[in-house]
Amino acid sequence: MGSISSPSLIIDLANAVSSAAKNLDTQLQSQGFPQPSFEADGPTYVVPKDAPKAAHEARVATAEAALKLFNLVSGPSELLPNMTASYHTIFALQWLHHFDVFSHIPLDGSLSYEKLATKANVPESLLKSVARMAMTSNILAEPTTGQVAHSANSAMFVKFPNMRDWASYMFTASIPTAAAMVQATEKWPGSVKKTETAYNIAFNHDLPFFDHLSQSPVMTKQFSGYMRSVTDGQGMDLSHLVNGFDWASLPDKSLIVDIGGSAGHASYALAAAYPHLRFEVQDLDTVVNGEKAAKEHEEAVSKHVIGTDNRVTFKAHNFFEAQPTKDATVYMLRMIIHDWPDAEAKTILGNLVPALESAKATLLIMDTVLPSPGSIPSVRERVIRTRDLTMRQVFNAKERGVDDWEAILRETDSRLTLKNLRQPEGSNMCLLTISLQDD
């Protein structure tokens, strides 16, 4: 009697896809969420940001199993062909975006290639080739031969201006910068200077990123839209900050200093949730003052309606200088340290030590903590690894693992101690609670 062979990896992964997909479908139906669809009116988020944890986990599990199965059955021989298709899809999207093709297509209908080419002022034959390449990734659709319509993916660029800005920034800055990484390493191997980066190579200049960005109103707008899109996503949502730390236990009228807090979106969100707390947002004078700042403050207030009780104030401060506010309960650095190489990061942290000592305060850092390779689903890990490479390409900075964080604290001041590390469910970042221990 022959032995019964165990299921193959192909079958294991296929079963995992089936099981996870059934679970996801159950979650969507039980919550009354619309089913995902390739049609133009399909939901932008398959699982809404505020959905239960189980729904998010089901989506990730489905995507992870499906991706693994795709990679397995593709095999090594298809690696480069698949990558070739990927970059041609990227540049097909760039072409469609540049010539504003999406805006000429009705959201609830279709039109011929001939009419679309005329409206976009592009050659019809080339339009067909580019659009049909994009369609292989469900960007646009051809419901009947010769007729072009929106898909859920392409409709997103019509419905959401921030997504258009993100696409513009990706094509204008992100892709050229990533492409220059080899040249930057050859020219400045091991450099940690913010003026010796792939971004400097890509744009042929010798300024730090934000200084160069400020010289271009167009790129500044694109970058702002890109950041709004990123922060609007589930992984960067401010709810993770609001719910991820025990703010409610802080004494009445405690002061929270939001260092590098820009327009104060994080502080306004916290102020709306915790009316017993006060907030001081610190950033450069050009950020907290002026017409642009006033507009952003107004937008932040309207988004997090908290009344006019003045619990959020602003102070001009450069975090490379000593911390001027010495009576806070919590000093907060959200998405700050990852922009800086170790030397500058230690300066930023070191400037807080006297204030932490004086007020016996807590330092709260919300930033990326790199996972161990393979310890989380690859559909999530690759997002984090992308940010790590971006930090290196643009700033000569990096995302850090737990050991890196502990080392940088220790090298700043041996008394700085990581007391707690927590990653809220669905968050791309972790909350690091740090205190200054007695000698």
Curated annotation (Swiss-Prot):
Induction: Expression is regulated by the aurofusarin biosynthesis cluster-specific transcription factor aurR1/GIP2. It comes from the Eukaryota. S-adenosyl-L-methionine binds at D283. One of its GO terms (molecular function) is O-methyltransferase activity. The active site is at H338 (proton acceptor). Disulfide bonds: none annotated. It catalyses: norrubrofusarin + S-adenosyl-L-methionine = rubrofusarin + S-adenosyl-L-homocysteine + H(+). PROSITE patterns: SAM_OMT_II. Keywords: Methyltransferase, S-adenosyl-L-methionine, Transferase. Its EC number is 2.1.1.-. SUPFAM superfamilies: S-adenosyl-L-methionine-dependent methyltransferases, Winged helix' DNA-binding domain. Pathway: Pigment biosynthesis. Pfam families: Methyltransf_2 (PF00891). InterPro entries: COMT-like, O_MeTrfase_dom, SAM-dependent_MTases_sf, WH-like_DNA-bd_sf, WH_DNA-bd_sf. One of its GO terms (biological process) is secondary metabolite biosynthetic process. Belongs to the class I-like SAM-binding methyltransferase superfamily. Cation-independent O-methyltransferase family. COMT subfamily. O-methyltransferase; part of the gene cluster that mediates the biosynthesis of aurofusarin, a red mycelium pigment which is acting as a mycotoxin. The first step is performed by the polyketide synthase which condenses one acetyl-CoA and 6 malonyl-CoA units to form the first intermediate, the cyclic heptaketide and yellow pigment YWA1. The C2 hydroxyl group in the pyrone ring of YWA1 is probably formed during ring closure by an aldol-type cyclization reaction. This is O-methyltransferase aurJ. It comes from Gibberella zeae (strain ATCC MYA-4620 / CBS 123657 / FGSC 9075 / NRRL 31084 / PH-1).
